Design a protein with these regions (language model features):
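Short, charged N-terminal helix-start/capping segments
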Residues: 33-68, 118-149
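Short linear elements at protein peripheries
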Residues: 25-26, 49-107, 111-118, 123-125
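Hydrophobic alpha-helical segments and their boundary regions
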Residues: 40, 76-78, 215
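Active-site neighborhood of HAD-like aspartate-dependent phosphohydrolases
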Residues: 1-58
Length: 236
């Protein structure tokens, strides 16, 4: 028998006003793990992928089509850009991610969001965290919330060293919908009875895949879409 599930975006949905990656960067800079060279590398990679700096095609990470100018810039220089990780050891990053969770994420974790997660778990609905953030950044939160699944960006690792690339397309926009549909098929989730929570208009494909979409702290575009479609709106 198929069963409903609950899907949560993380950044600015469960974590208020910021992202797991921003929290990680703050912690890494504070501890001297990431210096100016890493940030300049990220800047250069972003310029390359925007076509504003020379680079062979294989060195450019793809930017989703149809993004607004400011969203495109954010994607190019942070959310889709992992060049700053190049050369770091995976184990060290996992340890740093746990420190970032304790120091930066927990104080910003929505109390109401935690209550909603717990209520869905108590109702027997598996909780799936589906996020564009890196998997090792999401794992401490998955453990803390006792979520059943974490679907996240997977960094490429060679001999224990991060390359600054992802192994699969970045979970963003339409790609998040594809991942939701895939896990639903694999696990036998009834999407018409399932819930999804997200904050950004690029999450519309993700939200409209379930019977109970919820716009959380929505940006102006998502708020308008949610109001037009009669979706639930909440502020955490």
């Amino acid at each position: 028998m198929m069963k409903p599930a609950t899907f949560f975006d993380i950044d600015r949905t469960l974590v208020v006003g910021t992202s797991l990656e921003t929290c990680f960067l703050r912690t890494a800079q504070r501890r001297g793990v990431l210096g100016p060279a890493a940030l300049l590398r990220n800047l250069w990679a972003g310029l390359q992928s925007l076509g504003l700096a020379p680079a062979p095609p294989e060195d450019r990470f793809p930017i989703p089509a149809g993004l607004a100018f400011t969203t495109r810039l954010r994607y190019a220089f942070l959310s889709g850009n992992k060049a700053y990780l190049r050369g770091l050891r995976w184990e060290a990053c996992a340890v740093l991610a746990e420190a970032a969770f304790q120091e930066e994420v927990l104080p910003r974790l929505s109390a109401q969001g935690q209550e909603v997660v717990a209520a869905h778990r108590a109702a027997g609905r598996p909780v799936v965290l589906l996020t564009g953030t890196l998997d090792f950044l999401g794992e401490p939160l998955q453990r803390y919330l006792k979520a059943s699944h974490l679907l996240a960006a997977r960094p490429e690792v060679h001999d224990g060293i991060l390359t600054g690339r992802l192994t699969e397309p970045h979970p963003y926009g339409e790609r998040k919908r594809e991942m939701l549909l895939q896990v639903a098929e694999e696990r036998g989730f009834d999407l018409t009875a399932s819930y999804a929570y997200a904050d950004h208009h690029t999450d519309v494909p993700f939200l409209e895949s379930v019977g109970h979409p919820v716009a959380v702290n929505p940006d102006s575009k998502l708020r308008q879409i949610a109001e037009e479609r009669g979706w639930e709106l909440v502020e955490w």
